[in-house]
Amino acid sequence: MADGWRDHIESAGPGRVRIRQHGRMLADAMMVAEPEMLGEGIDDRSPQQLVNTAEIPGIVGEAWAMADWHYGYGFPIGGVVATSTEYGDQGGGISPGGVGFDINCGVRLLSTGISQRGTDISKLVDLLSKHVPAGVSSKGGVRLNSAALDSILSGGAASAADMGLGLQEDLIGIESGGLMETEERAISDRARSRGGASLGTLGSGNHFLEIQVVDKVVDIKSAEAFGIYEGDVTVMIHSGSRGLGHQVCSDHVKEIESNYTERGGRWVSDRWGFDIADRQLACAPIYSKEGQAYMDSMRAAGNFAFANRSALTQRVREVFREGVGSDADIGVTYDVSHNIAKIEDHVIHGKNCTCAVHRKGATRAFSGDHPEMIGKFENVGQPVLVPGDMGRAS
């Protein structure tokens, strides 16, 4: 992977840098950055990873890196790439590396109905630390039998609510209603075993549960639509599909990579006619057997993640009832994924496109006129939740 991308950068307007198509790239790459941020001394691997993603067969538009881009598995974290479903005979590439191992890792913002004034935040923090399981293990999670796990994998947040792990009224505040449609849900026994006891657990790494206070409201119209006011106490949850999602990704990375061989420093699939720069970008045609198997399993893991954040929300409700009594009214302001691939319709460079949009460390940002934006989101669009890492006081 030659480090030649620096010879092809140009400003694309305030806060945007273009890496012009060169070499085997099939499209330009765009970074949310300023040119001076790409000088000598930065970690060159992330821009090179972005350049590599622009070689994925069927790419439409540009390969994008959001403002917090950094090095990841195959794709840079913050990477967004769309591939056409109409490319070739079976569609463009779908890459597990473009979603990542924590499938449907996402952020949920909760309103509480209480003000910072007069609230014992320290007491709430202590109670949350006691009642919300965190760390690598699944200790303290909800144990699910096989039938209950199947229900979660197929029904997502709604199934969790049916089990008392969340409320049906929460669903309108969750991306896609907390449900990704699946068919076979053919995930491995190993993945199932890793999910059987981890529902309602936070995990480790940069995952967190954080009590926040609304310091300042800038967009009054949107804030009022979301029920957000200065001085309000809110709670933010950052978690995903735990070990189940990690295993689903691992299983399909192995399966798809087995169709590639190294040839001249590149990775080639003669079966699919795909030629990529990095093994970690291994992708299958969207409508191939392997592509569909990954998409279906990814959606099932995505449903588990929605249910996991719902179960965590219910733990927050219980803690606030204990800590502040009946004054607390926990509601879901919004829940959005930042590790997912979805089939979506977009207009790209003036042309209608049905495409598989990979978002890795990046969220969608739909405006109020999008068909999914109903109720309180209809006129203002969805919130885009941008947290800091655990301990950085988002």
Report the location of each language-model feature:
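Domain-length cofactor-binding catalytic modules of enzymes
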Residues: 2-49, 59-62, 73-77, 85-96, ...
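Catalytic-core region of right-hand nucleic acid polymerases
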Residues: 43, 82, 90, 100-118
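Short, glycine/acidic-enriched loop or turn micro-motifs at the edges of active sites
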Residues: 70, 105, 241
